[in-house]
Every structure is written in C-alpha cells, then in structure tokens.
Amino acid sequence: MRIAFYAPLKPPDHPNPSGDRRIAKLLVQALQLAGHDITLASRLRTRDASGNLLRQAKIADLGQRLAARLLGRYARSGEKPDVWLTYHLYYKAPDWIGPIMSAALGIPYVVVEASYAPKRAGGAWDLGHRAVETAVRAATTVICLNPN
C-alpha cells in the first residue's frame, strides 16, 4: 500500500532529535517492514508556540497552498497514495494538509495520536483547535498510542 506520511509537529527526518521525531521514524519503519511504500508527503511544521493568530493563519494558508501543489503533482504523475497518515496533531500543530488531500483524492485519512482539548476553544490557539476538530471528524481512523 502507498502511504503518504505527514507529521506536522516534526518530520521523521528532522535534524534535531526529539521523542516526537523518534516515534515518527519508528512508525515509518514499522510500516515499511510491513511491506508498505511510505512517502514523506511534507516537511511543513505547523507548530505555533506563542498563540499568534496571524502566524497561525499564515501557516494555515501555507498548508492549503501546499495541498493544492501536492494535488497537482499527483495529477501529473497519475499516481496517488492509497491512504494519508498524519502523526500527532494538536492545537499548537494542526494538520492543514491531510484532510484536504484525503477528501480531494478520495482516500482514507488516518490520524495517529490526536490531541483534542475542548478547553482550547476560543483561546489563543482557537484556529488550531478548530483545525484539529475538523481533522478528527474527517479521519477514517484515529489511532491512539498513548491512552492518557
């Protein structure tokens, strides 16, 4: 199966080590060992640590433009992924690409490790909070690695 993999917090090939990067790498390796063809769909990091609405809006716009570009690339190549998989989205680092891609391509949207906190509604990260809610609602499947 061809899987488009995306980690909005930190891509698996990011030069700075972190637990998030490690888990992303392990997910990719596990899927490859299972025989799947994994493509890193994007390296766009969507995290806004400061709660800056203007920055969040710019990141959202960038994600939407990147999705349009990726759709064009898939159309030109004649090949598309069988599934879109996003690892770890939360209100400070939402997925602005995956829901667009899966809807446009008619493929499943799988989320691994989604954090949705209703208390974030209306706050400094409301835009990201609403994006996570949209992504979780659009997801075909949500896989929870950490039950806490």
Feature-to-residue mapping (PLM):
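Helix C-cap/helix->beta junction micro-motif
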Residues: 34, 101-105, 138
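Glycine-rich, highly charged phosphate/nucleotide-binding loops
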Residues: 55-75
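Short N-terminal targeting/anchoring amphipathic segment
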Residues: 72-94, 107-110, 142
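Structural alpha-helical scaffold elements that stabilize or flank donor/cofactor-binding regions
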Residues: 76-77, 101, 134-135
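A short acidic, amphipathic alpha-helical/loop segment
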Residues: 96-100, 131
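A conserved, positively charged/aromatic
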Residues: 113-140
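A short, active-site helix/loop in glycosyltransferases that binds the activated sugar's phosphate group
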Residues: 138-148
